[in-house]
Amino acid sequence: MASGGGGGSKRCPKKQPTPEELAEELVKLRMENKALKSKLKEHVGDDDVVLTQAAKEAMVGSVVSGLTRSAAKQIEERIRKETLKATTKNEFEEVIKTLSFRVSLSYADLGGRASSDSSKASKPRGRSKHRAEKQ
């Protein structure tokens, strides 16, 4: 029984598209993509920005980094507080062995921002004097 994989068989190979057909399909897909992007912009509104995958990853990294800094600060404060009276290495290690942490974090700890304001258009940097002198 045939597998029906769509790849065709040796007797009836699948027809390969010509470069013209591929170019036509590409134009069609680009037009469809443009229409979908404009429809998405209408749906989202002017005050919001559609995230690209790269921008989303940058925002995730920014939030994780900020929350990690906040957690590290809380942990350090707790360790310093608990080991304040330790005067020897053994005392310090005994206190550390008994510590248990529960860190409370929230997005508000970051000041309420996941990223910089991407709505502002950034200006290109000017040419450096050093590079200008070389040319």
Curated annotation (Swiss-Prot):
Query: Which residue ranges are recorded for the region named Disordered?
Result: 1-20, 110-135
Q: Which InterPro entries does this chain map to?
A: Herpes_BLRF2 (IPR008642)
Domain of life assignment = Viruses
Q: Where is the composition biased (Basic residues)?
A: 122-135
**One Pfam family linked to the record:** Herpes_BLRF2
UniProt record similarity statement? Belongs to the herpesviridae BLRF2 family.
Q: What is this protein called?
A: Gene 52 protein
